Amino acid sequence: MYKLMRFYNRNRKKIFRIILIIVFIFVILKLLNYFTKIKANKKIEETVNNIDNALTTNNSTLISDKSSISGASIQSSKLKKDTDIINQFMDYCNNGDVSNAYNLLTDDCKKEMFPTIQDFSNIYYSSLFNGERKSYTIENWENDTYSVRITSDILSTGSLKGDETRQDYITIIENSKLNINSYVKKLNVNKKTSDKNITITVNYINVYMDYEIYDITIQNNTNDTILLDTNDDTKSVYLLDKNNMKYYFYNNELIKEKLLIQSNFKTNLQIKFDNSYKEKRNIESMIFTKMILNYNEYKDEKDKDKYNYYTFKVNL
């Protein structure tokens, strides 16, 4: 005991110093542990908030900030503005608010796809939503057009099947309105070409993801009935671009009677052409290679293979 007291008296300062160091280290460790727990709790809270936000925005996910076609980056401000309006539309649909969803559509989209709100409800809303909530992903396709993949919400339905995923293409128009159901846009053209006393005017083009519809007016100022096309050849009418690429018409959607134009008559016609939507495609003309300038004469021709068809080029 005496030796222990003697050791303590001789090393009292050192012992106190060691004790203070141990206490200091202990306090530091406690503080570090405390702040680590706070940081971890904050991360958990942020994660929960992110999940909640995702659920409130219908589980929407932006795939990338780059165009799927060109690979070019999209400006963050544009991306936010565009996805906000798409999210708004999807939110209306998820909540069964058909009226407000319909009001986000452009007038052109309404006219071409859904003339009435009932048409929109029956054709689009009931087909994709039908009272159910949906999850979806958004990916820029090209410029103002976005690919939206719509999937049954597993949290709402309790199941997820492969055949429950649908894809739509939604295009943002300048006034923050939408073209949906793969309808891209309307292009006003108003270009006319006259030849052989026949005038063809291209009024406008309705552009879809897989095809285009040209609205044209034909004025026949001749003394004979003309036939725009014999409609027996899938390649007799086509669009020609600056690289001499041809895009052929859907001849099965036209009937011969619509292609007949009496003398001094004017008629309106819509012709559908093949097209996988590309923003930079430059169409220069529409070509009719089997136009008949005198239909009565053509009818009397026994060997129609020898008939001298006229090629009419409409400049665009």
Describe each PLM feature range.
Residues 11-15, 26, 30, 41, ...:
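Exposed beta-sheet edge and beta->alpha loop/turn motif
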Residues 34-91, 95:
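Short, low-complexity N-terminal intrinsically disordered segments enriched in polar/charged residues
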Residues 89, 100-102, 216:
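Hydrophobic pocket/interface hotspot
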Residues 84, 98-147, 236-239, 243-249:
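Short solvent-exposed beta->alpha transition segments
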Residues 1-15:
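N-terminal Lys/Arg-rich, disordered targeting/topogenic segments
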Residues 224-233, 249-250, 283:
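Short, hydrophobic/aromatic beta-strand segments
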Residues 217-223:
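Asparagine-centered strand-capping/turn motif at beta-strand->loop junctions
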